[in-house]
Amino acid sequence: MAFLILVTLALASAHYSGEHFEGEKVFRVNVEDENHINLLHTLASTTQIDFWKPDSVTQIKPHSTADFRVKAEDILTVEDFLKQNELHYEVLINNLRLVLEGQFGRQVPATGHSYEKYNRWETIEAWTQQVTSENPDLISRRSIGTTFEGRTIYLLKVGKAGQNKPAIFMDCGFHAREWISPAFWQWFVREXIRTYGQEIHMTELLDKLDFYVLPVGNIDGYVYTWTKNRMWRKTRSTQVGTNCVGTDPTRNFDAGWCKIGASRNPCDETYCGPAAESEKETKALANFIRSNLSSIKAYLTIHSYSQMMLYPYSYDYKLTENNAELNALAKATVKELATLHGTKYTYGPGATTIYPAAGGSDDWAYDQGIKYSFTFELRDKGRYGFALPESQISPTCEETLLAIKHLARYVLQHLY
């Protein structure tokens, strides 16, 4: 038994060490003009770089910053290039391995589900069954499809049983490495269960609304971040003619598909796929929403990082018909979020606020007629990026819950 425990601990320690990222750094470069953008294009064409923000070198804009991860063997080359071309930069993360190890509160993550820890998919899957069986009056679970690798895509419905209730659809985990996203929706479900019948606002919301919650949108990719590559972003689909794996699910919806801010190269992180809704994961979500359009009044998709609340459009610079309303609602929502911990969010249309990107689920949902459609980019602003430590799960989820409740109350008061 002692030997088994030691082996288990050793395996866990090896997995969570982030050893593949030893010596890797994350840089932030100040981008002032088109010349700086061209220089970063040159750098990206000669060196393997993982862009964190924006998603791709093609989305860098003047008067902004670019965050990217560099492998240990390329660091000297990159630093020399930045210095020689007088590009001002800072190192956000000096050794990614250490930051990844530091994500966890202790060396070996807790067994079983925890709302204040990052959970493996197998744990989340079991949790969905448990919360459903323990709270049948508030929660039900259904399958809406399977992933490329054959995993069941579960959807939770949270709300007091009732006929013809309006609904809000909420998803997370479409980008596999954004672990704080699935952590939030688990927190949301917990708070709904815990405070129903005790806290007036949550009780009213669950009495009058249904919340469709997709715990992890990109399950295959999420599993891969736990078993092979913590920084994986895309799905895990394969196709004929390339050895490169995966499609960016947030470039795969039929909303200006592959028109701007997306790539047709299967090896790129923003690959839009061979066709709109080519991915089983995006198709499952789209089919469910299409089948329930009459009841779904808002669509929310949760990502990280950069502390932003975005609304359509991202595939075009045009404004929505209800832009003024969406802007006012976003302003009020991020103000509510900031009341707890003082966390500041930027808000606005996706294309102008962050960068243009076609094929996003929020734009697609809006074009389906869901006029309250938003993307949340949770903490932080780059100190940890995708490696947000578990110590920040609670404050992140607490403040985001305030925002979601505020937005949901508005939707309830403005049904259409």
Curated annotation (Swiss-Prot):
Q: Which residues form the active site?
A: E377
The keyword Signal appears for this protein: yes
Pfam families xrefs = Peptidase_M14, Propep_M14
Query: Kind of enzyme, top EC level?
Result: hydrolase
Q: What is the annotated localization of this protein?
A: Secreted; Zymogen granule lumen
**Known catalysed reaction(s)?**
Preferential release of a C-terminal lysine or arginine amino acid
- Enzyme Commission number, as recorded: 3.4.17.2
Annotated Zn(2+) binding sites: H175, E178, H303
Q: Which cofactor does it need?
A: Zn(2+)
Q: Which domain of life is it from?
A: Eukaryota
GO BP annotations, alphabetical order: proteolysis
Family as reported in the entry's similarity comment: Belongs to the peptidase M14 family.
Name it: Carboxypeptidase B
Taxonomically, what lineage is the organism?
Eukaryota, Metazoa, Chordata, Craniata, Vertebrata
Q: What gene is this protein translated from?
A: CPB1
